[in-house]
Each structure stands twice: as structure tokens, then as C-alpha cells.
């Protein structure tokens, strides 16, 4: 009897049906609801080996110990739901540490990268009183609103000499820009 594993979730689901019995007609119950059809993957996780070492590239100025980066292709949207999805990834990453609070929330940042400026997202932030601060050309910070510091990187606005590689992630690359990239490789 000691090795018996109690399945609590079916009992919980049944109990919630009974608790909310007066409104069963108005409710939908989805037990063990799949949040996603594919495995949840972070586009890029950048871990600072030594937290006191400053990152020279301005994209890394916001970095703490754990830095989650989400890339959106030129055709992908970057809206408020993408922000919340990325926050959810960060929350899961934080909670899956090897021990309780092994990954402290204060040591996590989020970076969302896209070619075009997410005008709709910035409008939403303004309407909701969320401060978006332009920190550098093409780099916008959002502090003190969500659980983690967020930066939005607009690759089209970045200075080419410092960010040639990110700026190359476009469908509109020009021949002279391609030649500059090839020279950088050689």
C-alpha cells in the first residue's frame, strides 16, 4: 500500500465540477489541456558565465545571468501576446532550476528581436501606461512592468557598423551589404 501513487488530478477535476455545478451549462472544462502542440523551445538562451563581466555590445547591456532571446522573422508579428509567451517561457525556465530559486527572477532578462518596429505593440504599451524607453538606436527597454526586464531590438534601426550580422537577417539585403558581410568573413 505504501507504493500506491494517488492520482489527485482526476479527483480535483471531479471536485471542481461539483463545486461549480450550478453553472455547468455556462462552463467548459478542459482537463489536462495541452498548451502547445510542439515542445516549448526558447530561440536562444544566453548565460553569462561571470555576472560581473559587462557585455561590450549594447545588445548585451541589459543582460543578467540568464537571458532569453526570441527572434521573429520579417513576416512574423511581435505583439503583446508574443511578449506574454516569452514571459511564460522565462517563468518556466526559472521554475525548472535544479533547486528552489536556483535561477532567481532578478537574474533573467528577455530580448525580442525583429526587423521592423512593432508599432502595434508600442501603441498598446502607450495605451496601457507601459513605459517604452529608446535606450540605443534600435534598442528599446521596458522595465518595471513585467516580471523581467524586456528589450525590443529592431534590427532595421541598429547601426550597421556595430550590428552588421543582425541587420543581414532581412529579405531586402542589398548587394553591397552582402559584399561587406563577405569581407567580414574573410
Give names to the regions the model predicted:
Residues 1-186:
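Elongated, amphipathic alpha-helical interaction scaffolds
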